[in-house]
A protein has these predicted regions:
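Bacterial Sec-dependent N-terminal signal peptides
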Residues: 1-25
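Low-complexity, Ser/Thr/Pro/Gly-enriched N-terminal "stalk/linker" regions
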Residues: 20-74, 82, 86, 90-97, ...
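Alpha-helical junction/boundary sensor with strong preference for TPR arrays
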Residues: 45, 87, 106-110, 130
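Well-ordered alpha-helical segments within folded domains of soluble proteins
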Residues: 69-84, 111-128
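General structural concept
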Residues: 102-104
Length: 145
């Protein structure tokens, strides 16, 4: 009976350890995939000479972009901030800052009920990760608007 108990516990411990390794691999693979996707978008935007925020892929495979007034405009800078946080890659910091800065005028959108999506994903994450008080100022102004 003790032998059965011992093997059961050992089997359980082994299974738990394997799962963590598999989960870690899946997480790492997804971070790597996100890094490539965001890198591809940044290259496409830079190549176009226009400053745009990607929001979706169409059925035709084209990337669709939006202006800073669109409720989804903060998601791309926010994704860069999250990737910066997950990867620790210092090269992503100026990129996240650049795409966040492009939304600065959104803080004055008094007619927009989705201002939180725009500002918190971009400026909120920037402030959370850097402590830069200029981000805080934009967040507070958006709250007043």
């Amino acid at each position: 009976m003790k032998l059965i108990y011992l093997f059961s516990v050992l089997g359980l411990l082994y299974a738990c350890n394997t799962t963590h390794k598999l989960n870690d691999n899946v997480i790492d693979e997804n971070i790597e995939f996100a890094y490539k996707q965001i890198g591809n978008e940044i290259q496409a935007i830079e190549k176009s000479g226009k400053f745009m925020n990607p929001v979706t892929l169409g059925k035709d495979g084209r990337t669709y972009y939006c202006k800073y007034t669109d409720w989804r405009s903060g998601f791309f800078p926010g994704s860069i901030w999250y990737l910066y946080e997950l990867s620790g890659d210092p090269k992503l910091l100026p990129v996240a800052q650049k795409y966040t800065q492009a939304l600065k005028e959104a803080q004055y959108l008094t007619w927009h009920h989705d201002i939180g999506f725009i500002i918190n994903n971009s400026y909120g994450n920037g402030y959370r990760l850097t402590g830069d008080t200029t981000y805080r100022s934009v967040i507070l102004q958006a709250a007043k608007s």
